[in-house]
């Protein structure tokens, strides 16, 4: 009997597109998917182009047959896996993040030259972007980085079938969850401080006084998401474990958990909510945490408030304080009537409540102010403890809104205008995460600890980087003062010297926070690691309560719950999960950062330059270096200009070697400046020959060239403001920075 022959499917699995696979892609994908209509906007009727389409189809079919005979390859469709990998490879090249082999580019260019109306050659990323649009891999205006993302952004539809078991009608009733017997009911108010657009509320802050000692205690109430998405359940495996994080992109939010689960677990004002509670006290002298603990509870009184509303409250307090100080200083020389009039004016100007929620009382204001003062103390403590190692990571981040048709609707500030309110929330969350880490370490629990890896060779090089010979730093307008843009550049340099934070199953040092006691526990609706922390600590709470009850079994509404609850995640399993989460979250973070840049540049090209081609951006100078004595800089830029998307000389073939051209040329620029574009909250590098562009200066820049998909932006300085530094012109550049804030 003749043995059965099994044909093995060979798939493209590498990152190098050689000639053979390039030809397979051309025959099995490019010629079958090519459609020049994808490059044009909808305008002409389909009937008018039907004849041309039929003619093009015949040409493509004839070309496919001819190439199949010449190359001795079958003209059959590529398998989905190979096609997807090759398309992602081409997309990475189109976005400027990857490289392509010369042989593959030559094969593609040779075939395209035979197709009527197609890009004649694929020589650079912009040509590749047009090719991907022509074969329908992406639509005009699409974020190509998102389209080519290799990770998962959405859970499979089959996950929705597993939700019903966790969304029963009785789940809102006390006793339907095994841990309800351990929950403590809280009737004190808790404040959820978020953006106005936030739909998933997973944390709130409360301040209570111990009835016995009278000491102040802070409580961070976190949504108990593991009630509705338990560890190792089919729902958890297909959603949270698969995605590991919610990905926030300007064009949309890709949730880690299904919307019904988020709606059930989120903290709400209209019903009691199950919470994971983190309690701690802050030493008023040292600022360190003390008397901390974790538990579970019911929250009955949630108060939602936005960052803008809290910031207005803090600004009002600062304004009243300044007026009070000014009034006291002048009242010594004023009559009694004048003093009384001044007091009335101070109260009138400081007592506005137009932007406050209707529920806010004097006691609520006092609690919110107390949260801010405690956060300031914690921030100062961390800064003092870290010393020179302290990293200021509060960089600006614009809020970009994208509408239908890939249209950028707005670019607004979401950090600088509400900095104090965000500091209050951030420090409370950092403290809560530190408490969870300490409790886990003290009880030998394996959780996803958060920290930074040891420095790689690239980070060591960045940390010890020195400018090339001949580069000189230009002195600031005021060497004794740290300007806004200057402080930002220092933070960027500090961050370049540390690695991205990762998760590890044992305690790990966090360079950014200068501590070994850190994890993530306050955002379980958007981070899988937080759910794992909750699971481990809740199992420990169950076991602790079981032991304290004399060995008796705690009763529950679910018969099988004691067996499930008493199973913590094994250390080797936690190690595997931490590695997986770190990898996926890093991919998501890179996608979010690159997408922010893409949509910002798209906003420049789509909205600003179409209305005003010579629009001038107000920019702050954060650093300037003189390179007129550093020939390496000039030589490097000449080579870069050769590879740039546009050639000033029309791409004429040069016969003089690059080294020879460099020796024959003068310097094209004398200075390199790091600037900050206030209108876009965007840091950039500008090359120029203007000696007045120094740290602290305010300049105006015009756009020379912009390519959003490639992340390419070229600016030219056209004016330097005279008569002062950025402090004098602060109202003008802040007006560009915060155009959406009436305050």
UniProtKB/Swiss-Prot annotation:
Its EC number is 3.1.13.1. Component of the mitochondrial 3' processome (MPsome) complex composed at least of terminal uridylyltransferase KRET1/TUT1, 3'-5' exonuclease DSS1, MPSS1, MPSS2 and MPSS3. Within the complex, interacts with KRET1 and MPSS2. Component of the mitochondrial degradosome complex composed at least of 3'-5' exonuclease DSS1 and helicase SUV3. Within the complex, interacts with helicase SUV3. This is Mitochondrial exoribonuclease DSS-1. It is found in: Mitochondrion. Disruption phenotype: RNAi-mediated knockdown at the procyclic stage causes moderate growth defect and reduces the levels of several mitochondrial RNAs, including never edited, unedited, and edited mRNAs as well as guided RNAs (gRNA). Also results in the accumulation of fragments of the flanking region upstream of the mature 5'end of 12S rRNA, the 5' flanking sequence and the truncated 12S rRNA sequence, and the 5' full-length 12S rRNAs. The gene is DSS1. PANTHER family: MITOCHONDRIAL EXORIBONUCLEASE DSS-1, RIBONUCLEASE. Pfam families: RNB (PF00773). SUPFAM superfamilies: Nucleic acid-binding proteins (SSF50249). Residues 1-67 form a transit peptide. Residues 186-542 form the RNB domain. Residues 325-344 have a biased composition (Basic and acidic residues). It catalyses: Exonucleolytic cleavage in the 3'- to 5'-direction to yield nucleoside 5'-phosphates. One of its GO terms (molecular function) is 3'-5'-RNA exonuclease activity. 3'-5'exoribonuclease which is involved in the post-transcriptional processing, editing and degradation of mitochondrial RNAs, including mRNAs, rRNAs and guided RNAs (gRNA). As part of the mitochondrial 3' processome (MPsome), involved in the maturation of guided RNA (gRNA) precursors by catalyzing the processive 3'-5' degradation of uridylated gRNA precursors. Plays a role in the degradation of 12S rRNA processing intermediates and maturation by-products. Belongs to the RNR ribonuclease family. Residues 320-357 are annotated as: Disordered. It comes from the Eukaryota. GO terms for biological process: mitochondrial mRNA modification; mitochondrial RNA 3'-end processing; mitochondrial RNA 5'-end processing; mitochondrial RNA processing; mRNA catabolic process. Coiled coil: none annotated. InterPro entries: NA-bd_OB-fold, RNase_II/R, RNR_Ribonuclease. Keywords: Exonuclease, Hydrolase, Mitochondrion, Nuclease, Transit peptide. GO terms for cellular component: mitochondrial degradosome; mitochondrion; P-body; protein-containing complex.
